[in-house]
């Protein structure tokens, strides 16, 4: 919901790239966290929490397939992972029509990543469809934000702060075509939504837009949502 959407809608669009496949990385621990387990306990066996967290994985799979991608789910393996829990995730992926492989590269090096490599090669051979972007550049800024919110995040509506409304008015008043730029939405990485406390696959929420910032040189509009701190662009040798 963050890296993939921006990669497709900004980088691939601007550089005419067509990915042959996309790897979706997950782990039993991450799924249990989305299933409501506190961080200190995510390494323990907990089938109920795993099942409760699966909607998050399914939401990402649906999103990637909507973009037209061949998807390979790569499960990062930990030494104490339970085989029955792994099998549940495997079956979920196969039922969703995507490939599945276990990645054990941390413990076994390259040999531990061979299964993932094989599945990726098979996916690449089959090939993805031409990218189906989340929005058209001809849409208004508000329409683009709403498209990403509904198609990728699972939200329903968008609200705008007074500062964001002023930002939009200023950008449009420039009358230089900046409304046609792609959007780069800044939000929490801990949820499909803007709220880090909303785990799993929340839906029907209202996305609160705080600011809309023109980055003319970079060629996109930054849309900040919720309480988010943007990543600083630092030089190779920060002061």
Where are these predicted regions, by residue range?
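P-loop NTP-binding site
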Residues: 1-85, 89-239
């Amino acid at each position: 919901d963050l890296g993939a959407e921006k990669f497709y809608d900004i980088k691939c669009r601007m550089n005419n790239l067509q990915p042959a496949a996309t790897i979706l990385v997950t782990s039993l621990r991450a799924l249990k966290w989305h299933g409501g387990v506190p961080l200190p306990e995510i390494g323990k066996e907990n089938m109920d929490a795993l099942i409760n967290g699966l909607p998050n994985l399914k939401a990402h799979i649906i999103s990637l397939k909507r973009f037209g991608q061949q998807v390979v789910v790569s499960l990062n393996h930990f030494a104490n992972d339970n085989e029955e829990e792994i099998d549940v995730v495997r079956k979920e992926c196969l039922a969703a029509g995507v490939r599945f492989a276990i990645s054990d590269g941390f413990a076994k090096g390259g040999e531990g990543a061979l299964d993932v490599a094989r599945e990726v090669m098979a996916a690449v051979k089959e090939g993805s469809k031409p990218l189906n972007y989340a929005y058209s550049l001809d849409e208004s800024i508000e329409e683009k934000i709403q498209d990403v919110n509904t198609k990728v995040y699972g939200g329903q509506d968008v609200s705008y702060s007074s500062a964001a409304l002023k930002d939009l008015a200023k950008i449009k008043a420039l009358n230089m075509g900046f409304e046609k730029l792609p959007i780069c939405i800044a939000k929490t990485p801990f949820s499909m939504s803007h709220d880090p406390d909303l785990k799993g696959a929340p839906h029907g929420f209202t996305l609160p837009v705080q600011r809309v910032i023109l980055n003319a040189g970079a060629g996109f509009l930054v849309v900040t949502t919720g309480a988010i701190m943007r990543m600083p662009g630092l030089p190779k040798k920060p002061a």
